[in-house]
Amino acid sequence: MDSGLEYVPEEHLKKFATLLDRASFLGKAEAAQNDFMTYCKMVWPEFVNGRHHGIMAEKFNRLATGDLKRLIVNMPPRHTKSEFGSYLLPSWLMGKRPTLKIMQTTHTAELAFRFGRKTRNLMNSQEYRGIFDVELRADSQAAGRWETSKGGEYFAAGVGGAVTGRGADLLIIDDPHSEQDALSPTALEHAYEWYTSGPRQRLQPGGSIVIIMTRWAENDLTGKLLRQQARDVLADKWEVVEFPALMPETNKPLWPEYWKQEDLLAVKGSLSVGKWEAQWQQNPTSEGAAILKREWWQEWKKEDLPNLDYVMQSYDTAYSKKETADYSAITVSYTHLTLPTKRIV
């Protein structure tokens, strides 16, 4: 059947094709405005999608709707942690809400400014402007501090940096600890004190917090916040997502599209058990062991201890990966015969 298109002037066909392409793009742009994963694929075409990215995207969608207010994501290095949490997330949310005030923090000011610069440059790009009609103020575009034309603000700071006088609708904390911090209980405590005395107090009513980090130690920021949650019913209630590099049940990679099993096993073989379990499996343990700790053992001094026939020990370790597990218990008992009655004691 003759379509009749051969009678349409070529310039009209080109205009029609352009309109179709534009309509298709607008449909994708609208989808990207409402779905984080769609947005990621539009602004980052080379993105290698993994199962954990879908889980994170679902959490970020809930964050955008206000259904989720407190989120902790623990994940291994080189698994798109910062790209998702400190680059794509703030740019997406700022596009959806150009009046949003975002505070971005990480373990150094230099890295925080790098995140700010990268996010700012994305929002100034043609690709981004095709999705969101948001402009940045020409007189406020420093890497660590910039504003939208509609009153939104982005402020970046390193752990320990001054945040006084700043308000935040969204607080993003990306890896608050460095490698050196993991070796220093004082540094871990400092990061927690800075969080509670600084950024946490800058949050606006109804604001949200996202902590996305690699685990380093039992007393890192994740560990301290979860213990505080367990102790105080009024404390922040966190939704926690843990991503081990190798799945415990199968020993297969979390992100097989990018990480081969043999590559992860090579990393494992190059690290101490403690570093591998903390940083790559999100299961930090103390240097004294995970189940039975040295400081739990006590010497029982008893004069004239009789000859013992049997010594019995029982252990209820309450072993769990959770920071809020029940206490472990250890008991020691014994039996011996008393003479001349041969009564068991």
Where do the model's predicted regions map?
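N-terminal accessory segments
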Residues: 1-69
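Conserved P-loop
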Residues: 74-76, 81-127
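Conserved nucleotide-state-sensing and coupling region of NTP-binding domains
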Residues: 105-163
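Conserved RecA-like ASCE ATPase "motif II neighborhood" in helicase/translocase motors
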Residues: 144-186, 192
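Signature of the SF2 helicase/ATPase Hel1-core->accessory helical subdomain module
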Residues: 176-247
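ATPase catalytic-site recognition across NTP-hydrolyzing enzymes
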Residues: 249-317
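An active-site-proximal beta-strand-loop segment
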Residues: 315-328
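Conserved small/polar residues in nucleotide/adenosyl-binding loops
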Residues: 335-341
